[in-house]
Amino acid sequence: MEIPSYASNIQPYGSQSGTKIASENDNAKSVSLSGDNSRSVSRTDKLSEHFSEQVRARQQESAETAMAQAKQRQRLNEEQLAKMVEQMNEFVKSINKGLSFRLDRESGREVVTIYEASTGDIIRQIPEEEMLEVLRRLAREQDHRSGLLMAKV
């Protein structure tokens, strides 16, 4: 913050910092308190009790608020969990797929067939049937002409 050049540091009524006025007010209060010392002590005790009651009440309120918020978070977490489970069930139902494992006798390899459970349509075979056919042909040719296959390679 920039102070303009026309600003003055002169305090009102000729005092430099206003401390003289404040100290005069403090002396007046201390004089009146020293006259009724027993009355001021009882007033202080009452104020102290009043403040401690207020502090206890606020602590009680804050504890109750914290507990209510924790219960609400727990309810939200339970609701979110239930919603997530429902979404997972819907997802699984939408992709209701079955797996079938089959061993191909000629190649000696396992073929995993993925099909739709309701219709039985084959979605994918790993390795695919075309690849198995190629492997079968290579195996047959190798049995008959193993030397020829080696010579070509």
From Swiss-Prot:
Q: Which domain of life is it from?
A: Bacteria
Return the Gene3D superfamilies for the record: FlaG-like (3.30.160.170)
Extent of Basic and acidic residues compositional bias? 42-61
Pfam families per the UniProt record, alphabetical: FlaG
Which InterPro entries does the entry mention? FlaG, FlaG-like_sf
Q: Where is this region: Disordered?
A: 1-74
Sequence ranges of Polar residues compositional bias: 1-41
The family database entries (NCBIfam families) matched by this protein are listed as: PRK08868.1
Family as reported in the entry's similarity comment: To FlaG in other Vibrio species.
Q: What is this protein called?
A: Protein FlaG
The organism named in the record is: Vibrio cholerae serotype O1 (strain ATCC 39315 / El Tor Inaba N16961)
Q: What is the lineage of its organism?
A: Bacteria, Pseudomonadati, Pseudomonadota, Gammaproteobacteria, Vibrionales
Its gene?
A: flaG
